[in-house]
Amino acid sequence: MAKAPIRARKRVKKQVSDGVAHIHASFNNTIVTITDRQGNALGWATAGGSGFRGSRKSTPFAAQVAAERCAEAVKEYGIKNLEVVVKGPGPGRESTVRALNAAGFRITNITDVTPIPHNGCRPPKKRRV
């Protein structure tokens, strides 16, 4: 006797109107995470995960593609307004914010939370090319 297949109930995505876009722009990669106001992650994307490897991963275009992919991932939550929090000195800082704006989000404010040492750790030695 065949058993009837048990259907899992489809999870309903919660509707969130306001979100926070956390952009971590390092010299090697750019990570974009969109959360709700409480900090629960709704979607994320990276430049490396978007198909860029090696030195192309650390370009503004790779950061733009990562932001577009992250925006697509959170469209189903109905986010309209975004607060942007940027951390790090990387090349993808500005292009990520532009891409989120072009994706249809209304950016309410931009905050820079790059950690600045009060003369803490010794920085890496200068490159000699």
Swiss-Prot record:
Pfam families: Ribosomal_S11 (PF00411). GO terms for molecular function: rRNA binding; structural constituent of ribosome. It comes from the Bacteria. The keyword Ribonucleoprotein applies. GO terms for cellular component: ribonucleoprotein complex; ribosome. Coiled coil: none annotated. InterPro entries: Ribosomal_uS11, Ribosomal_uS11_bac-type, Ribosomal_uS11_CS, Ribosomal_uS11_sf. Part of the 30S ribosomal subunit. Interacts with proteins S7 and S18. Binds to IF-3. Belongs to the universal ribosomal protein uS11 family. This is Small ribosomal subunit protein uS11. The lineage of its organism: Bacteria, Pseudomonadati, Pseudomonadota, Gammaproteobacteria, Enterobacterales. The gene is rpsK.
